[in-house]
Amino acid sequence: MSFNRDDDSKLKFKTSKKLKVSATFESMNLKPDLLRGIYFYGFEYPSSIQSRAISQIISGKDVIAQAQSGTGKTATFTIGLLQAIDSKSKELQALVLSPTRELASQSESVISNLGDYLNVTAHACTGGKALQQDIKKVSKNCQVVSGTPGRVLDMIKRQVLNVRNCKILVLDEADELLGETLGFKQQIYDIFTKLPPTIQVVVVSATMSKDILEITKKFMSDPVKILVKRDEISLDVIKQYYVDVEKEEWKFDTLCDLYDSLTITQCVIFCNTRKKVDWLSRKLTQTNFSVSSMHGDMKQEERDQVMNDFRSGKARVLISTDVWARGIDVQQISLVINYDIPDNLENYIHRIGRSGRFGRKGVAINFITKEERPKLKEIESHYRIKIKPTPANLEELS
């Protein structure tokens, strides 16, 4: 798991107290079998957020960790919780909550891989599949559950998920979980009331608004805050451009021109609605372009198949709504196209963060109509960046 160490080391953090920065995984005093899992997974040295946050999580403190996409936040909380788990006890000891099924499944995969030599058992509990499958899995000595709030709360209420000895709760992509948009906040509160009063809480996200930080006070005790300084959230490793298409109906031809001209490994195209995803996928397929698509209305088996095809490289172009913008890690994505400018400012950084993973160079291209120009200006102002016009010579993008 390589990343651009120079770019990562330039990140500046604002912390609530002076923190020890661990230059190596060995200096964190991790279990030998956990270290084996870390190195086998491909990590060589900790990223900036890992070098600051892992030791704080291991110490048992409540932690709020914020860093840009692709810097290893999932491994940060995973290493912390795996260090805390008692391998001899087969009871549930860690609970990870995520806003999407795909992200919950990805976290479970990272936990299982890093914890392989510890013989830790983990399971992803998400909607969209038979409840009985989850009940069967968690009843068999499951030490870590990674899931979506609705399914996890349902299983706790049914008393099939026993949380009485749970040591650590992780909220991944916390701004989504605690925001008003997706309606998870009450479910998070309800889950929290079922957990032991001594539970350690770790909150992780690429963006962290003042409102979300205020909400965390309700269930966190004097948390250590590790936040990227505001002017560092520009994702410098990603070249950002716009194409002024003037009218909505001209976007499609522009996309076809780009598709023909660019040499890419893998690409994600974001639309704001499920209807637009289906329309664009159908239209591109009719024009003999090979694409796959995914959104929240699809059955879970379909979404899983799309994800597997994209991860394996079988599919090169994926069209999606913002369900895919959060935390999903596919290393070979080199291009993100915002067919629609996101309605939510925070989603811009989550979308373009799909390219440039772990410091790799990536490109983001934004299609804008006359009506969308103010949105682009708002994004530039919010992130203190300048998004350039797409160069006439498209080879400059590669």
Curated annotation (Swiss-Prot):
UniProt-annotated binding residues for ATP: A67, Q68, S69, G70, T71, G72, K73, T74
Principal localisation: nucleus
Motif Q motif: positions: 23-51
Catalytic activity, EC: 3.6.4.13
Location of this chain's protein in the cell: Nucleus, Nucleolus
Enzyme class of the recorded protein, top EC level: hydrolase
Family: Belongs to the DEAD box helicase family. DDX48/FAL1 subfamily.
Protein name: ATP-dependent RNA helicase FAL1
Organism per entry: Kluyveromyces lactis (strain ATCC 8585 / CBS 2359 / DSM 70799 / NBRC 1267 / NRRL Y-1140 / WM37)
